[in-house]
């Protein structure tokens, strides 16, 4: 009986397997090999060049892994110690402290762009840390006017008038029944 060949499975290419072109050579080699069942049929399968190339790459990878002493899946292998960077070459920043040997020409990692430089000028306020609330309020109003916002000049009461008041006894829209009675559609 012939074995069924899966059409998605790539058959292995053996380097010792010869592709025979002449049928006369086929019969002489079959006679020289071990006796076979008379029902078996020899399959002359020629793999595609892509399959041959893939098989060669697999063989080279197997030979390389045997040479290096790493046999098995690369996922299960641990990294080699010579692949790890030396501790002296690693730059580890201190937590919250700037490096003393940092040159002044280095740029910061994050640069914030602002429209004007005087947005948060702390020199206006007193050095004691306590400044009058009026001064802060004036500064905020000036900044809001600069930015184009007039939030403090428009009262909020007008927006509250748009919300309708809730009734004490809500009624059904379809039959005007109150919440205590059952709604009946007429």
From Swiss-Prot:
Residues 67-81 have a biased composition (Polar residues). Residues 1-47, 59-132 are annotated as: Disordered. It holds the Pfam family FAM219A. Residues 123-132 have a biased composition (Low complexity). It comes from the Eukaryota. Belongs to the FAM219 family. This is Protein FAM219A.
């Amino acid at each position: 009986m012939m074995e069924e060949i899966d059409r998605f499975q790539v058959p292995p290419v053996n380097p010792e397997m010869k592709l025979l072109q002449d049928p006369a050579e086929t019969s002489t080699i079959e006679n020289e090999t071990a006796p076979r069942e008379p029902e078996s049929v020899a399959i002359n399968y020629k793999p595609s060049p892509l399959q041959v190339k893939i098989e060669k790459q697999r063989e080279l990878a197997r030979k390389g892994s045997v040479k290096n002493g790493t046999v098995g899946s690369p996922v299960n292998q641990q990294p080699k110690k010579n692949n790890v960077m030396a501790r002296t070459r690693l730059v580890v920043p201190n937590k919250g402290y700037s490096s003393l040997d940092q040159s002044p020409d280095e740029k910061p990692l994050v640069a914030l762009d602002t429209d004007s430089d005087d947005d948060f000028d702390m020199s206006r306020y007193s050095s004691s840390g306590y400044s009058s609330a009026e001064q802060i309020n004036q500064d905020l109003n000036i900044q809001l006017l600069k930015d184009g916002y007039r939030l403090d000049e428009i009262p909020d009461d007008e927006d509250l008038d748009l919300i309708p008041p809730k009734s004490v006894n809500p009624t059904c829209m379809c039959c005007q029944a109150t919440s205590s009675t059952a709604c009946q559609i007429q």
